[in-house]
Amino acid sequence: MVFLLCFFLVADVSYGINKDCLLPMDVGRCRARFPRYYYNSSSRRCEKFNYGGCGGNANNFHTLEECEKVCGVRSRDSPKEN
């Protein structure tokens, strides 16, 4: 019973969010420090991080506005700096 409750709570939070936004933050395998934004599904905000320049995943946006638009975040919920 508890499992089902947890499942539905998690499903409700992620329903309708672009699947790329649910990927974990990934700085990539290179060592550059490009400022980027990713959607943090725990805080439900777009947050800043430093991208290494290669590799990584699709949860990687050039601007806060792009992250918010793709991931459906309201501006008042962001930004959160890392």
From Swiss-Prot:
Coiled-coil blocks: none
Main location (coarse class): secreted
Protein name, as recorded: U-actitoxin-Avd3l
InterPro entries per record: Kunitz_BPTI, Kunitz_BPTI_sf, Prtase_inh_Kunz-CS, TFPI/VKTCI-like
Compartments in which it is found: Secreted; Nematocyst
Ranges for domain BPTI/Kunitz inhibitor: 21-71
Superkingdom, taxonomy of origin: Eukaryota
Family (UniProt): Belongs to the venom Kunitz-type family. Sea anemone type 2 potassium channel toxin subfamily.
Disulfide-bonded cysteines: C21-C71, C30-C54, C46-C67
A GO term, aspect molecular function: toxin activity
Signal peptide extent: 1-16
PANTHER family, alphabetized: BPTI_KUNITZ INHIBITOR DOMAIN-CONTAINING PROTEIN, KUNITZ-TYPE PROTEASE INHIBITOR-RELATED
Function (record text): Dual-function toxin that inhibits both the serine protease trypsin and voltage-gated potassium channels Kv1.2/KCNA2.
Record propeptide residues: 76-82
Site (Reactive bond for trypsin): R31, A32
Keyword annotations of the record: Disulfide bond, Ion channel impairing toxin, Nematocyst, Potassium channel impairing toxin, Protease inhibitor, Secreted, Serine protease inhibitor, Signal, Toxin, Voltage-gated potassium channel impairing toxin
Gene3D superfamilies reported in the protein's UniProt record: Pancreatic trypsin inhibitor Kunitz domain
UniProt source species: Anemonia viridis (Snakelocks anemone)
Keyword Signal: yes
